[in-house]
Amino acid sequence: MSVTNLHIAELLGRRADEAEGHRRRAYGRASSAALMWSEEAAAVAARSESLETLAGVGPSLARRIAGWLEDPGDEVEPPPARRGFRSYASALEQLGTHEQWRHELRGDLQMHSTHSDGKASLRDMAVAAAARGYDYISITDHSQGLKVARGMDEAELLRQGQEVDALNENLASEGMELRVLRGIEMNLDKEGAGDMDPQSLEPLDLVVGSFHSNLRSTEDETRRYLGALANPQVHILGHPTARRFSRRAGLKADWDRIFEAAARAGVALEINSHPHRQDLSVDLLRKGKDSGALFSIGTDAHSTEELSYIELSLSAAQLAGIDRERIINFWELDRLLEWAGSRSVG
């Protein structure tokens, strides 16, 4: 059996499940790091290079991984919270034979700045996105309901909008062909309602609506999704299942109904690129392939470095057979804004 980074991530995840205290946390961090290695550990070892060149790998862990590369043992099905994830290395390899997915992408529609829990300024995020050749990005800092992420209230959202307008003027004067869209990641309750005054959303270009509470529910949550899709303030449903690598498997729902409802409502379902989310998964994307629903790609980047997560969503969509025409990030800016304007956010 060939040992991949995904396999190593699972083996480390199992060690975390079995350990306690700081060892549990250390193995958990290592498992997450393995997902994001840009090259297969087996390829590094085959060149007789040190496995310590891989992020998060020290001498002890390098010896353990080397042992697994020699004898991984029997393959075991991952638990639900680690099932259906893919490694960054596999995404890069796949896109290497489908370069048009990178070349035709026009923008990234979910990211965060220092206006909420991001680590970089609006300008830093914009300049980094321009360097990637994007036509546009949407800044989607958290709304006020998510206190842990320093979510914005209506006054802060207005101030951010003024800063975005000034930034766009500055970028244009510097010859950068990038448009920063005014957006927000709005907290949705169990009924699908948002936490912001609708009037404060009217100047925005895009609203991503996301669930951030009651995420460990074991009940069927179809009703919650249908409420969100019926919310006229929402353009994009963010990280739809709310799954997190090694933490929770995601919400349960009738996904056939949800894809159909999204198609009728004209709401895009996000393919969240964060390696710990990868949400929607390839399996769900395949389920929604023929539904007529639209999709949106967002890295959920909280730093300029995390903009590279986009590869995971691109490869997932390509692997699932999603037509690029149904992914709004491949649209020209005028078409994107026309679509967004067709949905009332008031």
Predicted regions and their residues:
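Long, highly charged, low-complexity intrinsically disordered interaction regions
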Residues: 1-98
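Ser/Thr-glycine-rich phosphate-binding loops at phosphate-binding pockets of nucleotides
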Residues: 109-115, 136-140
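Solvent-exposed alpha-helical segments within well-ordered globular domains of core cellular machineries
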Residues: 10, 25-28, 32, 63, ...
